Amino acid sequence: MEDGSVSYGFKNIFITMFATFFFFKLLIKVFLALLTHFYIVKGNRKEAARIAEEIFGEISDCWADRSPLHEAAAQGRLLALKTLIAQGVNVNLVTINRVSSLHEACLGGHVACAKALLENGAHVNGVTVHGATPLFNACCSGSAACVNVLLEFGAKAQLEVHLASPIHEAVKRGNRECMEILLANNVNIDQEVPHLGTPLYAACTYQRLDCVKKLLELGANVNHGQWLDTPLHAAAKQNSVEIIHLLIDYGANLKCKNAQGQSALDLAAPKSSVEQALLLREGPPALSQLCRLCVRKCLGRNCHKTIHKLYLPDPLEKFLLYQ
């Protein structure tokens, strides 16, 4: 009986200690949250972000300091947005994560709101803590109109490697029109980013057939992917036979090996349609195909523009242009 009382006493002590620890931990988090709010009110967002990181372990998508301007831009309420601007609201207010109203407008594809913000001095190349620019958000939403407006106001189409890449985002989501606008503004068609590879590699990974076609047509390097992995390697892991044939037609090398020493055929699922397509194309290409690849290589990346200047018979010109 006495042993039971001792055991019960220890149990109560343990529960009390645990409850006290939990209470103090909760109290500290509440205090830090209040301190974060204080710094936001005072305008010291950098310190607020640091404290938020202490609370959450990483800077999370905390929207506690979203302004009415952010809400108006996100919802595409142009009249409300213009009213707030007329009242003197700063168009470059940002959240803890450095998300501006322009980021919100572009993510929602609200071109009228984006233009109003830009006309009133919004930073066109503002970067969030996650490396996203308004142009990246516009490509994410697939708004070609927003992309055009941003470029008109001086948005950088080609960004540093450590920032989120607009062209890769456009390709990932199959937003071909946004991709074409960026390429027309001198974005490197073979830009490689560490986690996505080149735009062509990304298009093959996400099976965006339209983007694959256009990138190849515009002269993307068919064998440049992600380090030693080629676009054909990426396509072989998926199930699009049409992309496999497209890549090989444009000169993809079936014998290329990745870092693990694997060819595209090694990566294809056994007895799949992709494996069959690769096996069928393993042999030597036709002489006409070799000639086409040779002519296009001699003319360079802009062959789609220069072939017309050769004044070739129409059927031959169409063959060289894969039409």
Curated annotation (Swiss-Prot):
Domain SOCS box: from-to ranges: 273-323
One GO MF term attached to the UniProt entry: ubiquitin-like ligase-substrate adaptor activity
Pfam families the UniProt entry points to: Ank_2, SOCS_box
GO cellular component, one term: Cul5-RING ubiquitin ligase complex
Subcellular location: Endoplasmic reticulum
Keyword line: ANK repeat, Endoplasmic reticulum, Repeat, Ubl conjugation pathway
ANK repeat copies, ranges: 64-93, 97-126, 130-159, 162-191, 195-224, 227-256
Keyword Hydrolase: no
Entries under InterPro entries matching the protein: Ankyrin-SOCS_box_domain (IPR051573), Ankyrin_rpt (IPR002110), Ankyrin_rpt-contain_sf (IPR036770), SOCS_box (IPR001496), SOCS_box-like_dom_sf (IPR036036)
Example GO BP: endoplasmic reticulum unfolded protein response
Entries under SUPFAM superfamilies matching the protein: Ankyrin repeat, SOCS box-like
Pathway assigned in UniProt: Protein modification; protein ubiquitination
Subunit structure: Substrate-recognition component of the ECS(ASB11) complex, composed of ASB11, CUL5, ELOB, ELOC and RNF7/RBX2.
Family statement drawn from the similarity comment of this UniProt entry: Belongs to the ankyrin SOCS box (ASB) family.
Function of the protein: Substrate-recognition component of a cullin-5-RING E3 ubiquitin-protein ligase complex (ECS complex, also named CRL5 complex), which mediates the ubiquitination and subsequent proteasomal degradation of target proteins, such as BIK, DIRAS2 and RPN1. The ECS(ASB11) complex acts as a regulator of the endoplasmic reticulum unfolded protein response by mediating ubiquitination and degradation of BIK.
Name of the protein in question: Ankyrin repeat and SOCS box protein 11
Organism: Bos taurus
UniProt lineage: Eukaryota, Metazoa, Chordata, Craniata, Vertebrata
